[in-house]
């Protein structure tokens, strides 16, 4: 690649590419905005499937971008289906591994052949899009990976190979699964009293060629080649785990929560702050509804972008909320219920019409959680949701669905003291009891005090000039991302 003339060529240009799922897109977009605030030209790359979904949900001009923050797309090989269709995880994984490298490199070369923008000087990639490492090495530019889950999840994933070698996974059969999941694993650094049930749930497979296990090994086997690895966490939350991780991957930097850095550094009324990439249409009425409610009176319910409930489960949640007598705001997105999105019975809707609001789409979760009316969060324990709830000072009721959400549940409820368990099997009586306890009980009060303390520590980590996340972010920006000189190749 040739360096372009003119002052614009001296401006660093970050190519940012998330894994194409909502929970991965959100933190990457925040990271891209933070780089833009530090003077980077940013190209944000979506795959075709999600590019179309964003245009459907946010309108035809949603991806126009700004002169120094542009959106591009690469083909992903996925068929175009209904905009609200649930993405097939295995197809998504297969398509990114097999289809994205060549068009990604072609995009970089095309951008570098123009004269209106500086050449791409670094790649910021989701760790799950590890083909970008090959592109960076070929083009001789640094690549920083973003790990969008917790540091704890990463250290567990890094030991999946050892679980296989010790013949702990895959299971021989699933006949005694419950007993097997109680197996204590005592040989992972910084992990005390952790059981298989607390691992991301791919450990339950009986398939020696399980594609998710293969994908985990594929990703964790490649990340050591990255120039640096960002984790959206902060030192005091996962201190011991981060120390252990750095003995395996010295280039790890805790730089979260991104939400705090974004709030500190980017004006809320700026054009860059307004850029969004939600895959579902976002409603705007919930905040007005919350304005009519008393402080900490409402429980917010959202199971994330990938959770699929059975009709029985959603009915148990519904009647548990009804029986609690509490006001609630519940996101019931399209595709959330297996087979029937309109399963909520008329009796439930009638009984709760004056104290419940249902959102049939998507909402600005950060704004909802930070609203004074929110007193609790019934959540699937996705990592973004966990950090957003922590930052808002809102305690959680934890009902994980899959993957690292089970790990997050364990640490929220047992180690960090910010969550309550609802149990794997959903029963309306249990939902009622836990909601009441969180909103009104002594345990709920203790959790609320603890989460407020964690929020204070998160803010300390993000504060200049000496906060750990602030210093780590500055270190990578200055020593990895902006020190690279484009040379002819």
Curated annotation (Swiss-Prot):
Pfam families: UDPGT
PROSITE patterns according to UniProt: UDPGT
UniProt keyword annotations, A-Z: Glycosyltransferase, Transferase
First-level EC class: transferase
Binding site for UDP-alpha-D-glucose: 305, 363-365, 380-388, 402-405
Signal peptide (residue range): none
GO molecular function, one term: UDP-glucosyltransferase activity
Tissue expression per record: Expressed in roots and shoots.
EC number(s) per entry: 2.4.1.-
UniProt family annotation: Belongs to the UDP-glycosyltransferase family.
Name of this protein: UDP-glycosyltransferase 85A4
Originating organism: Arabidopsis thaliana (Mouse-ear cress)
